[in-house]
Amino acid sequence: MKKIAIKIGVLSAVFVLTIILTALLMNSENTDNMGDLDAATLPVVMAEIDGNLVNPMFGYRQQMQVDFSREGLTPIDTIRKVKIAVKPFDQKIQSLSYEIRTSDGREILENQIIKKLTKSDGYLKAILELKSEKMRMNQEYSLKIQLDLESGPVYYYTRVIQRSGLNTSRYVEFVQGFYQKCLNKDTASDLADYIEPDNSASSSNFTNVTIHSTLDCITWGALEPQMVRTGVPVIREINETTGSITLSYQISAKNTDGGTELYEVNDFYRMRYTQERVMLLDFQRSAQQVFDPTLSVANAQGLNLGVVSKELEYITNPSADIVAFVQTGDLWSYSQSASKATKIFSFRRDKNSDERDDNQQHNMKILQVDESGDMDFVVYGYMNRGPHEGYVGVAVYHYSSTQNAIEERVFVPSTLSYEFLERDLQKLIYVSENNQMFLLTGGKLYQIDIEEQSYQTIQDYIEQDCFVVSSDNSHAAWTKEMDPYGSTEVTEIDFEQARTRTLKADSGQYIRLLGYMNEDLVYGFASQKNVQVDSNGKVTFPMKTVKIENFDGTVKKQYQKEDLYITQANLSETLLEMQLSEKRGNTYVYKTTENIMNNKKAVEESVTQNTVYTERRGMVVRLDFKQTVSNPDPVVLTAKVKAMENANILDMGVEPSDEEAYYVYAKGILDSVYSSPAAAVNRADAMTGVVLNRRQQYVWERGNKKTKIKLNQKEIPDAVLDAPLSVKELQENLGDFASVLDLTGCTLDSVLYEVSMQRPVVAAIEGGKSLVIVGYDAYNTLVYNPEDGKTSYMGMQDSTEAFEKAGNIFISYIENMK
């Protein structure tokens, strides 16, 4: 018996040991392939102007489309030398070369290899001497700098422009002095001379500080911040009159417990230089606090996120116990019951972080969070570090809460810059339960099979005005003809089911998309003969019927009113507002407004977003839970990254549409895109911005109009001097020489910019006649009359009134790049 007992004991011990070893081996297998994102490796390149470093350029591993990569603007003088400084970050640079292209990227004007780099203050410096005789004044060009590293080539992009009378150094030095002075109230008193405080700006919101904020708010109130990382100015726009610069930097502040808070700050400055000093025309600052759960962020009410924009993306699991949110480029998950905060994804490193890690040209979208805390999400934009460092694209990830690890499922690279990619993805990105991803990019709608690593194009060309998406991105619809007021057929898609349906207008009618109410499509019908376009280009689309219909074809609501037409419809999440008009002859006269309310019952949210005023930080954002938060100090975890066994890269080779578009840039960012140059000019005027066309030529600039000019009529094409009021006719007569700009609906003051840029403007006057504006001064316009061939002055006020009476019909052109 004793031997049997010993034998049983030995076998039991062996069994237990086997279980332990097996568990250890399995755990090793589960953790050996997990780690962190690899550190950033690529150098940073900057331009140098009069000893000041400007326009930091981050490296790309693939060549970008220069007409969709609008980086900083580097002014050059008549000598046409560009000084650059390379911050190598221990990388060995084997060679440096550069290439000058036209702004649309179609023609290479020059390429050279730089044989000599000099070392200075930790930088490698070089001088690029641009020699191409094809470069013209006042025209942007793309400069691509190529560094050859041991790991392969890396590309850097900036824009260059040759203009006279610029005050670049004065603007740069003003910005550097202004933001530094803001950190020290003792030296900030003279800043009061530059700002314009009034009641339009909040004095307690550090996420939205403007030129109209108080001096106390501009100098950070009671926050008492310290500089962590200084900023390098980025020149966005500059001309003989004004300059616009953005600046990104980091500050820190001590909380009441002595903990250190970190803030990402973005400044925008628009300036004009007079003979005496720099004048500040506009100033905006946004500070965003980096979330740090070690700073006692949880209290009885909820989770204090600190100084952050109210446009915060967050989503909960079904029971609302777990909330996921994106803050300053970091993705976090907070579990109330487990009192646990997990950093799911971040390019920012906890220690030894530098400007490459904190590059803000990326964003995230949370797709879903399940009950256990597992999460699907998308990271899109420039990849600061990791396996796709230096690439722009869309990465789909899955987070496992049990393993506390993320796994990349697919990466779709793009040659569009972050701001263009974001514009598309903000409109639509959706991943179904069947692992089908639908996204809008480059003006096309794609379906990607994540498991099969394959894709197909659902719709080859999409006009923004003809494409609508439901609030949860699960449905979308577009018109067949891609004409918002001239389409007869609509296609709607259910992304979860990957099914489409078609809606057709009856013969003699047009169909118009209005949007979505919940997941129901809202659209209307109008008789083709009733659709009108006035002299200002404004379209009247009088609908007799408006329908609200789900994907299965069930009409939830059909609205029509006898003898009245719906001439305008405004749709929000909760309300469809319709303006009803009566037809009198060929015009429609407004009668009344009627509304259709969203009858979907509001779901009571268990997690809500609120703002709270604090003495030191001003307005802060808090996520409030329905249940009281019991533990103020959550456990803090950081998710690991699963190593990829195979490269999950799906290169779709997206080529943007060649259709003409007009881009409005304002306050340092891409503000909007229009198909109409007139609409773009009006928007840029309101936003104090600029307009560029598809080829990145300046169509219009706010504040860069000469005080007077007189064009040489001998240099004006005869097709323009004939003063046709038909855009089509003028384009046919100009041929490939130029592209016509229909500026109907703009003000006279706006279109005089075209004259200032040596582009005459055809203007309508009463009686169906027209004139050509060939010059102006402070008091008059100079107009050419095609009927008698004479040129005469016309008072500015008389000109304004005459053109307004004729409907402000203006037509100009811009020479095509050769």
Language-model region placement:
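Conserved blade-ending motifs and adjacent loop-strand segments that build the rim/top face
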Residues: Q464, R501-L513, T554-S572
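A short hydrophobic beta-strand element
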Residues: Y141, E237-I251, G373-V379, L521-A526, ...
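Conserved active-site-adjacent core of cysteine acyl-enzyme catalytic domains
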Residues: K710-K818
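Surface-exposed, charged secondary-structure patches
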Residues: V14, I20-T31, D67-K83, S95-Y123, ...
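N-terminal Sec-pathway targeting helices
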Residues: M1-V16
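Core segments of small alpha/beta cavity-forming domains
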Residues: A39-E99, D104-I108, E140-L223, V297-K340, ...
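Beta-propeller blade signature
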Residues: G390-N404, V490-Q497, K538-G553, M597-N598
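Beta-propeller fold detector
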Residues: E110-Q112, F283, A341-D350, A405-S414, ...
